Design a protein with these regions (language model features):
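Hydrophobic core segments of alpha-helical transmembrane domains in multi-pass membrane transport
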Residues: 21-34, 62-63, 87, 117-120, ...
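Single transmembrane alpha-helix segments in multi-pass membrane proteins
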Residues: 27, 31-94, 129-136
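Alpha-helical transmembrane segments within multi-pass membrane transporters and channels
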Residues: 94-146
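Membrane-helix/interface signature in polytopic inner-membrane proteins
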Residues: 201-235
């Protein structure tokens, strides 16, 4: 009987330790519902998901670093740099203070998207080279990359004619792509939520159904054991 009590007590402690954040979050939600019953309205959840979608997509990328038992301080700054470049390419042609007045027609959305991806890949390749080839700690490498990305963003925005100013007045094609929604009767599902859901599905498949994903978990769990097992930890 004493053994069973100790086992139950241990399980309870383990449960609280593993799910403390979820319990606290649940209690916070209950308090908010009591204070503001309108919190449970479906439209409110749609708004929350919409605002969280961009951060969620960023979090999926950072999660890859966590799986590898690493860290990335530069993700936010790299995102900002990508956003600045892509935003400058989708400004409305009727906006007099646009960054590129020589662009007289709306560019295909694939171009700013490709520019963002290339910038992100370049910075991440720099991080990867520093960690894998130079054997530097990910914290130090990403700290430096963070500074470089922020500096590059400031220089880019300041290069506008007349000096630095906010990038605004985007074309309708871009606004519809970002702020549009999929309508089913009276129900509207913002595109941002769909983009996040698709990204999450892709990442889930990569992590759980591919050799790459399994190797990532192996390296994150035990780098030396993964290397002995034949996993190319540098690649």
């Amino acid at each position: 009987g004493g053994v069973d009590v100790e086992k139950k007590k241990f399980n309870l402690n383990e449960f609280l330790l593993n799910y403390a954040l979820y319990i606290i979050l649940g209690l916070m939600i209950i308090v908010v519902i009591i204070i503001e019953p309108g919190f449970l309205h479906p439209s409110n959840f749609i708004k929350i998901l919409t605002h969280a979608s961009t951060r969620g997509i960023l979090a999926l990328g950072v999660a890859g670093m966590i799986v590898l038992a690493g860290t990335d301080l530069s993700a936010g700054r790299i995102l900002g740099c990508c956003a600045a470049v892509s935003a400058s390419l989708v400004q409305a042609t009727t906006y007099a203070s646009r960054m590129y007045p020589e662009i007289t027609k709306d560019l295909p959305l694939i171009l700013p998207l490709a520019a963002s991806i290339l910038i992100g890949v370049a910075f991440c390749a720099l991080n990867g080279f520093g960690v894998a080839k130079l054997n530097l700690h990910a914290f130090i490498v990403s700290l430096g990359t963070q500074t470089i990305a922020f500096g590059a963003t400031c220089i880019y925005i300041d290069s506008q004619e007349g000096g630095a100013q906010a990038l605004s007045s985007f074309n309708e094609k871009f606004l519809n792509f970002v702020n549009g929604s999929f309508k089913i009767g009276s129900f509207e599902l913002p595109y941002l939520i769909i983009y996040f859901a698709l990204s999450a599905i892709v990442m889930w498949v990569i992590w759980n159904k591919t050799t790459l994903g399994k190797n990532m978990f192996a390296i994150g769990g035990n780098k030396e054991a993964a290397a002995v097992s034949g996993v190319n930890i540098t690649k």
